């Protein structure tokens, strides 16, 4: 046998041995000691090195829903060499996040999370101890005080209502003007400005200058943000990708750096005018708490205020923008639904006054539409990933401490065991008593904001804001597209899934003022 052949054979043997050793090492690393009476969550075989990253594809929520039908509500995959437990099914998720909430309240230590407010984000930080819990309560109280709490200086029922009415009326005028002058518009670029001004007013007591550089940077950067913190982002599980050319990751880093600088500047400017006897917004409330507690070793030093404001801004911004944009697309796709909402608004409110938050209970079809929007689109397909805080079990399966957990909200909202015709858009499914009352039991099955100890702190203000924006828009406007225009509702995957761009939306006045 020639020397070259021996050399080739030797090389192949070395390569085969190396591959075997790598596979053996990975398998050994992944193997955990399962307590007696419990089982390891089932799942498909993955590829060496890659795991199931190819299985997830471009739409992980759909791929994992399909796997749940085969392996059940508790299954395990690998992304790279990292094991991930995927939870589906409403009962299973409630058991984990509510009844066993302390076991599943952690956050995995993912690379993308470390880039958000320098790794100090209350929402994305792995910390879930007493200090985190206290700051979360403080953030909730501040958000409640300057959103859903009553405003003694205004005729509106609360601060949120006052801000939304102003911005919604401005949006109505702007959409009418664009339709009259241009003939059509792209909704998200119009909606996002109004929503940003609402959350800006609640956080800082002021609106952002319209079309300013800061506003445009926030709008552009928000899409980069949601793309990079979605469940299954490869950069979190394959460290080498952090060092290779990655335009998406670069934009994500730049957005976070710039947004923190923007918040630091805005918070510092706010502090110059701070008057603890006249608190008008969330940041002022946080300043007051910091001032009152600094002598007693308080829970929130001033340098943490930027981090909390960042989380609150995010909680009230992207979700609301996406919900309103999707609503407009759904209404032009199902014009009969829009007509029913118009009829309800005309009957209950009329045209002599504007809708208020207090009208919600009297507008069941509007509420049913919003619930079906959340369920049908499931535009937050997964919660932000969780992790286990200790060794635990679920449905007879052993889940060790620090295991990354994906919560598949999209599966819950399209589960054929829970919903009749889950892929049909039908707001009436939520109505009872001759379509006059919301079915509370069914409405509580819709998942969009998570559950348990990590439930989105902005859920209630976000729901109120979506309702009031839509009620004011639909009282005054009729949305349509030119004949023959097709609206594509296929979403692009991310932390929040975005609809395809549609530049041909029209908004026509329903009556003369």
Curated annotation (Swiss-Prot):
Keyword RNA-binding on entry: no
Pfam families reported in the protein's UniProt record: p450
Locations listed in the record: Endoplasmic reticulum membrane; Microsome membrane
Involved pathway(s): Cofactor metabolism; retinol metabolism; Steroid metabolism; cholesterol metabolism; Lipid metabolism; arachidonate metabolism
CDD domains referenced in this protein's UniProt entry, alphabetically: CYP1A
Cofactor(s) required for function per UniProt: heme
Name of the protein in question: Cytochrome P450 1A2
UniProt xrefs under PROSITE patterns: CYTOCHROME_P450 (PS00086)
GO CC terms, sorted: endoplasmic reticulum membrane
């Amino acid at each position: 046998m020639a020397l070259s052949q021996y050399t080739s054979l030797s090389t192949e043997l070395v390569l085969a041995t190396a591959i075997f050793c790598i596979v053996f090492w990975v398998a050994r690393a992944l193997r955990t000691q399962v307590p007696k009476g419990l089982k390891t969550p089932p799942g498909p075989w993955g590829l060496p090195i890659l795991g199931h990253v190819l299985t997830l594809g471009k739409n992980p929520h759909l791929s994992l829903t399909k796997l749940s039908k085969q392996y059940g509500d508790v299954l395990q995959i690998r992304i790279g060499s990292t094991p991930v437990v995927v939870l589906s099914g409403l009962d299973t998720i409630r058991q984990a996040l509510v009844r066993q909430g302390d076991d599943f309240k952690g956050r995995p230590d993912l690379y993308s999370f470390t880039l958000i407010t320098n790794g100090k984000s209350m929402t994305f930080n792995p910390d879930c101890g007493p200090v985190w819990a206290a700051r979360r309560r403080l953030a909730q109280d501040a958000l409640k005080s300057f959103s859903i709490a009553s405003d003694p200086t205004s005729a509106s029922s609360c601060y949120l209502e006052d801000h939304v009415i102003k911005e919604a009326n401005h949006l109505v005028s702007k959409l009418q003007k664009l339709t009259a002058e241009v003939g059509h518009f792209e909704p998200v670029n119009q909606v996002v400005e109004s929503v940003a001004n609402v959350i800006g007013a609640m956080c800082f007591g002021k609106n952002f200058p319209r079309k300013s550089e800061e506003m445009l940077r926030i709008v552009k950067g928000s899409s980069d943000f949601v793309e990079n913190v979605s469940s299954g982002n490869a950069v979190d599980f394959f460290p080498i990708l952090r060092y290779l050319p990655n335009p998406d990751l670069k934009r994500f880093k730049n957005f976070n750096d710039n947004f923190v600088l923007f918040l630091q500047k805005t918070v510092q400017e706010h502090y110059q005018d701070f008057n603890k006897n006249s608190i008008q917004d969330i940041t002022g409330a946080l300043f007051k708490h910091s001032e009152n507690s600094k002598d007693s070793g308080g829970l929130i030093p001033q340098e943490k205020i930027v981090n909390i404001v960042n989380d609150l801004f995010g909680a009230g911004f992207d979700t609301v923008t996406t919900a309103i944009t999707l609503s407009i697309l759904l209404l032009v796709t199902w014009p009969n639904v829009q007509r029913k909402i118009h009829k309800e608004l005309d009957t209950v409110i009329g045209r002599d006054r504007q809708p208020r938050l207090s009208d919600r209970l009297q507008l069941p079809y509007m509420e049913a539409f919003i619930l079906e929007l959340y369920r049908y689109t499931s535009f937050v397909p997964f919660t932000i990933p969780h992790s286990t805080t200790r060794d635990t079990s679920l449905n007879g399966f052993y889940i060790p401490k620090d295991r990354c957990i994906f919560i598949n909200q999209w599966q819950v909202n399209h589960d054929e065991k829970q919903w009749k015709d889950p892929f049909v858009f039908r707001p009436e499914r939520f109505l009872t008593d001759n379509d006059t009352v919301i079915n509370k039991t069914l409405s509580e099955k819709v998942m969009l904001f998570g559950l348990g100890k990590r439930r989105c702190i902005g859920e209630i203000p976000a729901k109120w804001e979506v309702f009031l924006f839509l009620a004011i828009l639909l009282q005054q406007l009729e949305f349509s597209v030119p004949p023959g225009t097709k609206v594509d509702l296929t979403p692009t995957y991310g932390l929040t899934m975005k609809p395809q761009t549609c530049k041909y939306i029209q908004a026509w006045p329903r009556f003369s003022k």
